[in-house]
Amino acid sequence: MALINEHFLKLQNNYLFSDIAKKVNSFKVTHPKDKIIRMGIGDVTQPLAPAVIEAMHKAVEEMASKDTFHGYGPEQGYPFLIDAIIKNDYASRGVFIEPSEVFISDGAKSDCGNIGDMLRHDNSIGVTDPVYPVYIDSNVMSGRTGVLENGKWSDVVYIPCTAENNFVPDLPSRRVDILYLCYPNNPTGTTLTKDELKKWVNYALANDVLIMYDSAYEAYIQDPNIPHSIYEIKGAKKVAIEFRSFSKTAGFTGIRCGYTVVPKELNAFTLDGQRVQLNKLWNRRQCTKFNGTSYITQRGAEAVYSTAGKQQVTATINYYMTNAKIMKEGLQNCGLTVYGGDNAPYLWLKTPDGLSSWKFFDKLLYEVKIVGTPGVGFGPSGEGYLRLTAFGDRDDTLEAMARLRKWLR
C-alpha cells in the first residue's frame, strides 16, 4: 500500500492565482463582451529581445547538424552562460563568485521550492509578511510549518512589513533557522538599502541563520544606492543562497531559465554539529533530480549579456518601469495610497474605505474591469492591500488609469 506525504493535505485547496482565475472566468461568463485589463499575475507582455531570438535560432540550427548537435548538457549549466553571469552580474559589482557556485535552472520558482530538499524537516522558518506564496507552500509540503491557525502557520515566524514600519522588517524575536528575503520585494515593490540588508547579514552571521535571498527583480532597481545582490554585503557568502531569474529581467516567463548561487563558504550542520558544505549537497541534488536547462535556452540567456542584448533588455525594463510611473502617479492622483513601483515592477495599493482585499478585488473586477491580486493572499499583513503589476501593455495601462479616474471621481 502506497502512503502519501500527508503534509500535502495541509495545503490550502487552491493556489492564490488559481482562485483569481476562477473569479475572472466566472465574470467572463456573465460579461462576455467586457474587456478585462489584467494587472494581477506578474507575467510579462513584451516580446523577447531580438538578440535573444537570434541566438536561439542559431542554437536550433546547430541541433540540425551532427557536428553541432547538443544532447544532455551539464546539470550545473553550460560554462558559456555561467561565465557571462559571473562577469556581468557579480564581477561588475565587485563580487567574486566561482563558476562552480552557479547553478543554471529552469527558473527561480523551481529552485526556491526545491532548495529545501537538502534541509531537515524540523528547521524553523522565518518569512517577511506579506510573502511570495511559494516560500510558505514548499515548506508546508516538507513538514516545516506546523498547522494553519487563523491564517498563520504555527511553526512559521512572520515578520511584518507594513506601512507602520516603512516596509522595513525588524529582526525576529523568535529563533529561526532559515529566513526568506525577497528584494526588490514581491509583492510590496519595496527595497532595502545596503545598511538595512547588512543588518540581516550580521544577524545571520551571529545566529547561524541560513538566508534564502530572492533577487529575481534586481534588474528593475533604479536607485544606485540599492544593492542588487546580497553578496555586496561583507560576510553574506557565509550565510546566504541567492536566487536569480531571467523571467522578468528578459521576458523568459515562457522560456524558463534562472540560476542559483550557492557559495562554497556556506555551511549547514548535522544533528551532532558537524559543518557540511551546502554547495556539495545542492550539486548532488541537481545531478540526481535535474538534467540541466536546454542548450537552446541557455544560448538565449547568454545573449541577454551581449552588447545588443543589454540595450534591448534595458529598453524593455524601462518600458515596464514607465508603466509603473504612470500607474503610481495615476493612483495617487485618484487619492489612493500606493507603495513600491520605484525600484520594482509591483505597486502595493492600500484599499480605500477600509475594504478587505478580496472585497476591493471584486469591486475592481465588476465595476472597473481591472484584475489585481488581493494582498491577503500573500499573508496576514497583506490584508487591506492589493498588488498591481506594471507588466501590461502601455495602452492598457493608460486605459486602466482612465477607468479608475472615472470610477473614483
Swiss-Prot record:
Catalyzed reactions per annotation: (2S,6S)-2,6-diaminopimelate + 2-oxoglutarate = (S)-2,3,4,5-tetrahydrodipicolinate + L-glutamate + H2O + H(+)
- Spell out the InterPro entries in the cross-references: Aminotransferase_I/II_large (IPR004839), DapL/ALD1 (IPR019942), PyrdxlP-dep_Trfase (IPR015424), PyrdxlP-dep_Trfase_major (IPR015421), PyrdxlP-dep_Trfase_small (IPR015422)
Q: So which cofactors does this thing need?
A: pyridoxal 5'-phosphate
Keywords in UniProt for this one? Aminotransferase, Pyridoxal phosphate, Transferase
Top enzyme class, one word, equals transferase
Q: Which GO terms describe its molecular function?
A: L,L-diaminopimelate aminotransferase activity; pyridoxal phosphate binding
Which Gene3D superfamilies does its entry note? Answer: Aspartate Aminotransferase, domain 1 (3.90.1150.10), Type I PLP-dependent aspartate aminotransferase-like (Major domain) (3.40.640.10)
Biological process (GO) annotations? lysine biosynthetic process via diaminopimelate, diaminopimelate-aminotransferase pathway
Q: Which residues form a coiled coil?
A: none
Q: What is its EC number?
A: 2.6.1.83
Q: In which pathway does it act?
A: Amino-acid biosynthesis; L-lysine biosynthesis via DAP pathway; LL-2,6-diaminopimelate from (S)-tetrahydrodipicolinate (aminotransferase route): step 1/1
Residues with the modification N6-(pyridoxal phosphate)lysine, per the entry, are: 248
Binding locations of pyridoxal 5'-phosphate: 72, 108-109, 132, 186, 217, 245-247, 256, 291
Q: Where along the chain is substrate bound?
A: 15, 42, 109, 132, 186, 291, 387
Q: What does this protein do?
A: Involved in the synthesis of meso-diaminopimelate (m-DAP or DL-DAP), required for both lysine and peptidoglycan biosynthesis. Catalyzes the direct conversion of tetrahydrodipicolinate to LL-diaminopimelate.
Please give the NCBIfam families that the UniProt record associates with this protein: DAPAT_plant
**Of which family is this protein a member?**
Belongs to the class-I pyridoxal-phosphate-dependent aminotransferase family. LL-diaminopimelate aminotransferase subfamily.
Q: Tell me, how does this one assemble?
A: Homodimer.
Record-given protein name: LL-diaminopimelate aminotransferase
What is the protein's species of origin? Answer: Parabacteroides distasonis (strain ATCC 8503 / DSM 20701 / CIP 104284 / JCM 5825 / NCTC 11152)
